[in-house]
Each structure stands twice: as C-alpha cells, then as structure tokens.
C-alpha cells in the first residue's frame, strides 16, 4: 500500500519499518473484520493511528471462492502458480466474472475505527499471463477496460484503479480528516 499515493501530509511506515515482525492471525469472517484486527494490532504496538487492509479474489462461478481465504486457498504453502492453474481448470466452460475486494480499516489510539471497501470487477483470463507486475492472482485477473491482466498493467495504472486504491481514496476522501 505504500506505493499508492494517499495524501501529501501522511508518512506511511510498515510494521517492519517500526521493527515489529509479529504475525497477525486473521481470525475474522470478513475482509473488514480482518482489516480491523490488523489495524488495531498496529495501533496497540505503535501507539500511532494505523490502517490495514484485507483483500481477496472472489469468483462468481466458484461461489465467491477463494474470498477471504485467498492467501490460504488450497493451503498456505501452496504456490500461487498452482492455485491459479487450479482455478483455471475449475472454470472450464463456466462464468468467468470475478472481483478483487479490499477492506481498509483505520484505527486511532483512542479506539475510533473507520472502514472502507474497494471493489475492482473483472474476469478470470483463459490462461495465465507472463506479465511482470503484481503478485498473487494478478496473472489471471483480467481487466476488460484495459484488455490486459492485472499483471500486465504497470504500477502507475494499477495504483490508480486497484481495489486497494479505491478503498484508500474512499477512506481518506470521506472519513479521515487530516
């Protein structure tokens, strides 16, 4: 998220930048709940306002799977290449509509919690791209308006149109006063 321009008065540091390397267990049942868990953790550890996200890929023909379990789909240690090939095989002759969803939670040291959602609609491509950008499922997430997968879009475009960028813009434009 550090690469997405948010506001010129905000300096973003990651937990690692702050010397915090703890794993945060995502026990929520929604993107929003997981984002809140992570943001509260960061605020408790640093004493600073914090925001965190939780994101996932939802595929209509797969009953919105992998969803909040996107990173753990088919097992945490399963490489994304295997996960993507599995999805492509599952979608033979099926509806390919999909969306990336992102929930952002902003938590203050006084306990105020604000959340925002961003959704980017697209399709699952028919084959995996070799695009150099992105991670996770970006090589199979196709953006019809650009006629490219997310992995084929350069960062300057992705950082404007992504589900994370939408959620951040919404959060800072409507809810957070700086």
State what each model feature region is:
Residues 1-178:
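Anionic-ligand binding patches
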